[in-house]
Amino acid sequence: MLDQREWTLGMVADGVPELVIEILSPNTRLVDVFLTMPRFARAGCPSFWLVNLEMPAVTAYALDGDTYCQIAHVTGEQPWAAVLPFAVTIVPARLLD
């Protein structure tokens, strides 16, 4: 996978990841949501998760055509049992442990 600078410059990697997990920060939040997310959707990445460590929260999206649809939003100690792209249970508050 390409690093952020290469992806921003428009270079293309071979293949598409099954999952992108983007850690939000105040400095890059707008870029992550309004630039990075649509780029991965256009590339065909089936799963995109946004992680907000400040809340803490996880918002998961699944590809529907060429855009993402939100499939889950969990905060704090609330568990989420993801099925795709693989089975895993996530508790946002425990991401900081």
Where are these regions (language model features)?
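C-terminal interaction segment
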Residues: 1-43, 47-97
